[in-house]
Amino acid sequence: MTKKDNKKGFTIIEVVLVLAIAGLIFAMVFIALPALQRSQRDQSRKNDTSTVAAAINNWNSANRNGGTFSEESLRKYVDKLDQYDKSSELKVATPGASMSVASNEIKVMRGKKCPSSTPAPSADDPANITLQNGSSRNAAVVVLLENNGSQKQLYCQDV
């Protein structure tokens, strides 16, 4: 009689192969996660920019007789911001040809419009942006995005 050897289970090669594949998947997720988080924070900053732009439009509608908004009057029209503290990081800049924007603030300049071309990414924080002249009811809302991590990108929205 012949004795059959019917052992059940996995060989060491099969176990090592499964662990190697799982390790590769884990490494890919681990590498991609920071970029995904940066992208989500940047999208949230863009949404905050739109929220502030809508607040400026609401202020303009409520104050048809003119005048200029201040930080305090603008904050009344902003419910909440995701990436910024509206009481300390929402700032109205003094009108001028350019302004600097740090990564922890959202800045508004009255009477200006965004430049026609997007400023090049840089490692500067704060970064400077030169704005175009606009009417008294125009405003430019500017934030500094993380972009790819090593370089920052200015994002500007006209009102």
Regions from the PLM with identified roles:
Residues 122-159:
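Short, surface-exposed interaction loops/tails
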Residues 91-101, 109-132:
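Surface-exposed intrinsically disordered loops and tails
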Residues 38-49:
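Membrane-proximal amphipathic alpha-helices
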Residues 10-20:
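N-terminal signal-anchor/signal peptide hydrophobic helix marking the start
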Residues 1-10:
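N-terminal leader/signal peptides at the extreme start of proteins
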Residues 22-40:
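C-terminal juxtamembrane segment of a hydrophobic transmembrane alpha-helix
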Residues 68, 91-103, 137-143:
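Post-signal/leader-peptide non-cytosolic segments of secretory proteins
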